[in-house]
Regions:
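Mature catalytic domains of secreted/periplasmic carbohydrate-active enzymes
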Residues: 1-134
Length: 134
């Protein structure tokens, strides 16, 4: 039978499919559905003994501090600057929410850092956070 499932928590558009307290750009605050589907999935996985894996896009076209837009936007589209450190704090904040609000998480699948290959993603800091919380 099925051993695990992976669900998208946030894709490149930055829209969170979970109840994020860090941003209102999420399923709870911006849709009529107003249900946390990651919570629903976590509960179903626990009930059926299936490991829950979370897909999370590190690139975020919506967040004002994700600048420049990177390769997918040909480094264009925003006249403002942006604060990379602030964006990384935001990203790690959302990861903290995901790793502390939904029970046991089997793993995380990152995507999108390829969009800004030359950026300092500070992956060691993110990986240390994951291991600290998990």
């Amino acid at each position: 039978g099925m051993k695990y499932i992976t669900i998208t928590t946030k894709h490149h558009d930055g829209f969170a499919m979970f109840d994020s307290k860090i941003s209102d750009w999420d399923i709870m605050d911006r849709t009529v559905y107003q249900k946390d589907i990651i919570k629903q999935m976590a509960e179903a996985c626990k009930k059926h003994n299936i490991k829950l894996f979370l897909y999370y896009s590190q690139l975020d076209w919506h967040h004002p501090d994700y600048y420049p837009r990177g390769d997918t936007g040909n480094k264009s589209g925003r006249p403002d600057k942006g604060d990379w450190e602030n964006y990384l704090d935001y990203m790690n904040g959302q990861l903290t929410e995901l790793l502390t609000n939904y029970g046991e998480i089997g793993g995380i699948w990152f995507d999108g850092w390829w969009d800004k290959k030359d950026a300092d993603w500070q992956l060691r800091k993110t990986y240390d956070l994951i291991h600290e919380l998990h």
